[in-house]
Amino acid sequence: MKIIGIIAEYNPFHNGHLYQIEKVKEIYPESIIIVAMSGNFLQRGEPAIVDKWVRAKQALLNGVDVVVEIPIAGCVQPADRFAENGVRILNNMGCEELFFGAEHAEYDFMTYAQLVQNLDSTEFSKKNISYAEAFQEAVAAKIGHNIDSPNDVLGLAYAKANLKFGKKLKLNPISRNVAGYHDKSLSPDSNIASATAIRKVLFSKDHNLVDKYLPSYQDLKDEKYISWDDFWPFLRYKLISSDIDELANIYGMAEGIQYRMKKKALELKVEATFDEWLKAVKSKRFTYTRLTRLSVATLVGMKVNDVSLYNKFPYVHLLGFTKNGQKALNIMKKNSEIPLLAKISQQDKDDFYHVDYRAGKIYQSQNYKEQDLKRAPLIF
């Protein structure tokens, strides 16, 4: 029994994701597939278009055997930390191989990881460019070419994490089929489109265009689609009503950015949108993605201590499984060092799960569905 791991967001689950799962089954027909998935807020600091339960259901109905949630403190992170938290979870769940999409599947990501493992990240802050740009420059100098496509960047991050944890996973990059990560339009000649293009159409309400790109559209068509527009009034209130010292304790705050975030929230016209606020706050050092992650941390009140605690005492939330997946869960219970939460209790929500619970309640304010407390895993 081969246990395969995937780290994903499924925002939403589309035919490109299905293609990846089918490739796994083609290579390992009897495998068990475990997915470590982002929750209601995603790695790049965006709210998921539909909640984690809908996305987990879509995965389980399309070939995945177990879906677990990467807690928000491990998920809303730069690529390296996101990858590290995902790989740590999959290692502890007994996965032997990691499959992931890549723009350049021919790259030897593990060799690249060995070449860049000793980069001095403290030097990056001395340059008048973003951390991501400084990192890209340093990587290119080590390996001889740029790695700047989104999934290649994640592939390198997975390899670095795998190196850190003793190379327990075999890495299997799969070429992205047709659509690029940030492609904004649907191709009429293919049934695969980027999640970016699909979300754009779903938000436009022109849903008849998107059906062929989604294997589980019926699960999506009656959902309310969530975006930053839904949470901007809450974030703006938080920025205006919080004092500077309080904001300074939010995870990711640095270089006094809290002053600028608060100032622009106060100064912009009443009808200003989240995107307009982002443009007003953005600088060379603070990219849009860095600011959206900061925005999530501010919205849910995720502090430096919360992330430190998660790093020391990680946990994972079980969202759903199939009968086949139950076998992998039985193995994990015997061998894992990370607690697996099947149902969130009152004690959990008041203890280590409090940030995830708060994030769920904030998301629930817009989709009106209980996200955590006493909610049982999906079983198929």
UniProtKB/Swiss-Prot annotation:
Family annotation (SUPFAM superfamilies): Nucleotidylyl transferase
Domain of life: Bacteria
Protein keywords: ATP-binding, Cytoplasm, Ligase, Nucleotide-binding, RNA-binding, tRNA processing, tRNA-binding
Enzyme class per UniProt: ligase
Protein family (similarity comment): Belongs to the TmcAL family.
Entry annotated with the keyword RNA-binding: yes
EC number per UniProt: 6.3.4.-
Record-given protein name: tRNA(Met) cytidine acetate ligase
Taxonomy of the source species: Bacteria, Bacillati, Bacillota, Bacilli, Lactobacillales
A matching Pfam family: HIGH_NTase1
Annotated organism of origin: Ligilactobacillus salivarius (strain UCC118)
Catalytic activity as recorded in UniProt: cytidine(34) in elongator tRNA(Met) + acetate + ATP = N(4)-acetylcytidine(34) in elongator tRNA(Met) + AMP + diphosphate
Compartments in which it is found: Cytoplasm
